[in-house]
């Protein structure tokens, strides 16, 4: 009898629990529903120059594309520091679901955006140093979580391991929570479709050719060099360079800058850098600069160099004697569309 009563009570309790659980499940939104209700934001981190449409087309894409459009679109931010400050100062009720970053970039010289307001470009190593030295603000705990996705649309950025580490650290909050970071490994093109006029995000494989800025070689030499450098590439370089098939291939070119400044105690300590051979010898005597160039993977003779004595203003506002070198290499890329997003 005791056993039977216990059994009856247990059956009743079990049924009651099942009913409560069923009610609870119906009242508590699923994790998927929570994520669907969270907001998204896009940062356009630059402006177009003459004959460029990268940022304007990206703006249209993230405003109008059914799948990719974001709840907010911000166009005035121009540094990683300002970006992090903005996210901290404009929190939503829930962490962001998706953060889109649109920026010019490349595997060689990183992102075309300043690290600090008014500071230097976000080269991979320099960005990582800034994070390690705690020069950038930490994201607050309510800004992101482990479900937040950050897409970085900068050409080939995802193939640079140092840049990936730096970005991951930038978007780790004060509690150590990390986002789901996606950095594009392909070339990124925002392209208007001929048939319907809509803008699509296209990812493309790319094959680079480097030359001194202002010294573009003939198309036949570019074709020959690409064929020798990439013999197994699934593309007809001759047709691509001559632009015979515009529907399948795209051409892009941009500059890779290198800047180096050395400060001297007095003007007399500065060596003479008037002649071209003196300039080249001075550049080659700078071991760290030469190491940086080697890490870029761009041959030294593919840079156009200017070397001058200058007056440099240091961190304390003092004017000091210095020598500054600026190297510019142009990279010409042949692109082949892989897929549209």
Stretches found by the model and what they are:
Residues 1-7:
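N-terminal secretory signal peptides that target proteins for export/translocation
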Residues 98-102, 106-193:
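Catalytic cores of nucleophile-dependent amide-cleaving enzymes
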Residues 84-92:
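Short amphipathic alpha-helix with an adjacent loop that forms part of the alpha/beta core around
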């Amino acid at each position: 009898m005791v056993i039977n009563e216990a059994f009856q009570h247990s059956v009743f309790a079990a049924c009651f629990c099942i009913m409560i659980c069923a009610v609870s499940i119906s009242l508590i939104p699923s994790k998927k529903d929570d994520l669907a209700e969270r907001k998204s934001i896009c940062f356009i981190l630059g402006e177009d120059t003459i004959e460029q449409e990268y940022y304007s087309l990206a703006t249209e894409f993230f405003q109008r594309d059914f799948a990719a459009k974001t709840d907010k679109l911000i166009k005035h931010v121009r540094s990683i520091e300002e970006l992090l400050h903005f996210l901290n100062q404009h929190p939503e009720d829930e962490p962001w679901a998706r953060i889109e970053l649109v920026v010019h970039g490349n595997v060689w010289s990183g992102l075309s955006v300043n690290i600090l307001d008014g500071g230097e470009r976000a080269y991979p190593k320099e960005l990582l140093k800034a994070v390690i030295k705690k020069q950038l603000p930490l994201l607050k705990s309510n800004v992101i979580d482990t479900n937040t996705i950050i897409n970085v649309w900068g050409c080939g950025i995802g193939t640079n391991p140092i840049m990936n580490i730096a970005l991951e650290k930038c978007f780790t909050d004060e509690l150590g929570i990390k986002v789901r970071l996606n950095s594009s490994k392909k070339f990124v093109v925002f392209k208007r479709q001929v048939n319907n006029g809509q803008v699509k995000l296209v990812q493309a494989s790319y094959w680079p050719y480097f030359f001194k800025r202002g010294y573009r070689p003939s198309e036949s030499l570019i074709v020959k060099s690409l064929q020798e450098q990439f013999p197994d590439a699934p593309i007809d370089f001759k047709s691509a360079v001559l632009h015979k098939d515009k529907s399948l291939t795209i051409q892009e070119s941009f500059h890779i800058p290198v800047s180096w400044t050395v400060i001297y105690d007095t003007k007399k300590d500065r060596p003479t850098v008037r002649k071209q051979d003196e300039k080249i010898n001075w550049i080659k005597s700078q071991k760290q600069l030469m190491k940086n160039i080697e890490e870029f993977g761009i041959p030294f003779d593919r840079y156009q160099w200017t070397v001058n004595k200058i007056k440099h203003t240091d961190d304390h506002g003092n004017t000091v004697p210095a020598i500054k070198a600026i190297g510019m290499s142009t990279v010409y890329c042949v692109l082949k569309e892989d897929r549209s997003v």
